[in-house]
Amino acid sequence: MTTKIVNIVVAGGNYAGLNAMRHLYATLLASPVQANKTVVNITLVDRRDGFVHYIGMTRGITEPSFGSSLWVPYSTVDWLQHSQITIKQGTVADIQPTLVQLTNGEQLQFDYLVVALGISRFAPIGIRSSTKLEFVAELAESYAQLESAKSVVVVGGGAVGIELAADIKCDFPHKSVTLVHSRALPLPGPFKDELRHNVVDILQNSIGVELVLGQRVIAQEPASADMADTLTDMPEHVLSTATDATLTLSGGQTLHGDWVVRCLGTRDKKSIINLPSSTQEPIFGANGIRVKDTMQIDDVAYPHIYACGDICSRDTVKLAGVAMYGAYIAAINIARTISSVSNDSPTLEESPLYPSKILLLMSKDHFIMQLGDEIWEKEKTRQYVSDDMGLQGSINGLSLNKVPAAYSPFDLAPAF
């Protein structure tokens, strides 16, 4: 029997991409496909040389010693050194039906693709670095500006802006910290106003952050780089900070900040997804790549392409845990298809729709959570809170410190 070679590309690392890699390894490499004489090669494409625990970035800026632990180099992960795994450090420029092209011109042909490229933010919340050494240096740069500032203004009252303002004020209680948000209450999204009012109370009365709500920043002098370069494909390389800046608000008020950081939303990766739709519906919708419950792209032309994590349309609120579960579904469905010894298509797993959820970590002592329509009590929420902002849990969950156990893709995983 002729040996069949199957090439899988996972575009993007972190929570979704690495969990896809973990389950592809456990189902296809740790227990090699024997019955149909298949050799599987898996390529991970990531512009960084390691995993970054993005959830901890706000505290990584205020506590650089903690921040340096957020980056786990791929070279330290034993199972990623498998002979049938290739780690390609590079940036994806274009995704077509059978190939991924990198910005250096290299093309990677695939039989199966997992798109896990996430979404982008401007630096320093978005990560400019491609190596841990660069990451540590950039954290130190942000920390130096923060440490020398007497007054800090955070613009944008989404989850990241809220957590950053809280971490700064708690780690530097003598600094003036102001959070500016354009709406009457912070935290956009499908959440209750009761939750938003609780957030306001915690920030103002428990932590001491000054809030300016219902006003937009209409001018900033000097402007930060992101204000002039909002159309870039790589916002992570553009700083959203300014020093010694004056902000003019829509209500006529002016604010001064020795250090100003703008946390104003995300940018998608629509420009690199060049997959013609076979219907009138675009492949990339308003909330990301349209996917089925199986995590396959929702188009009959692309049963071999999966998308998971923040880049897909699956969930309104983008969460690391949901990204990991979607990646698990994608990986086992690919493994089932490859491992099937009959000509019949195997039954594919489907991902359930999860209720919206948010857990806000407002420094080490203050946190709040809404799951679906329920706002959880603090003591009930505490079980999901750790001093390291979930770092060790993510390392364990992604098997970055151990080799994943082999299992059959036709069985449920020991843990997703």
Residues covered by each model-derived region:
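C-terminal, flexible cofactor-proximal segment of oxidoreductases
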Residues: 13, 317-322, 326-416
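Eukaryotic N-terminal targeting leaders
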Residues: 1-7, 25-39, 80-83, 223-241, ...
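FAD-binding core/adjacent interface of flavoenzyme oxidoreductases
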Residues: 3-11, 35, 39, 44, ...
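Conserved N-terminal glycine/acidic-rich loop preference
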Residues: 3-6, 47-65, 113, 124-161, ...
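A Rossmann-like FAD-binding core segment of flavoenzymes
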Residues: 41, 83-90, 94-95, 174-293, ...
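Rossmann-like dinucleotide-binding core of oxidoreductases
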Residues: 151-155, 159-203, 209-212, 321-349
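Beta1-alpha1 glycine-rich phosphate/pyrophosphate-binding loop at the start
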Residues: 2-86, 166-191
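FAD-site-proximal beta/loop scaffold in flavoenzymes
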Residues: 132-150, 254-325
